[in-house]
Amino acid sequence: VESGIKRLNISLDTLNPLRFKQIARGGDLETVLKGIERMLELGIAIKINMVPMRQSNQEDILPLLDYCLERGIELRYIELMRMGHLNQDSVYQSEFLSMQHLLDEIGTQYSFERTDAPFDSTAVRYKVPGKGYFGIIANESEPFCTSCTRLRLSSDGYLYGCLSNTARTYVGDLVDEPTD
């Protein structure tokens, strides 16, 4: 908080400890959840990003939304992207869940309405009356490439203009240089 952090985006694909270890390739779910609770206590706004996948975590779609709505956290479902090993048709097709599939599943438990979003938003945002919001980043169902204004900095110092493209620029040296 003293550093000026006002908001965090956290990737969390499940509330199941075993599944968490599989998807995250290690780590401890309880530590992540305690960290989320602590950030909320400090007044830091949180958005949680989940990539729903048919075989890996489909049963977590509603429980994670429940968790987020109970805490005033906006959950962003992100459609699976064709990246890395997921670029293989067989893997991608067995795991991909469309925006409509997500809306249908959420609709079994919640009423919701689509809300207006800023022009440069990558998410389609929905309001659950009296509960909160969730969003869907539907890069496959509703591509937004022409209006995307995002740049991404990887943990190893590369700047990406698009997650669907392998083009990147190393800026790690610039980030590491002290400023006057």
Give the ranges of each region predicted by the language model.
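Short histidine/acidic/glycine/proline-rich micro-motifs that form metal-
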Residues: 51-55, 82, 92
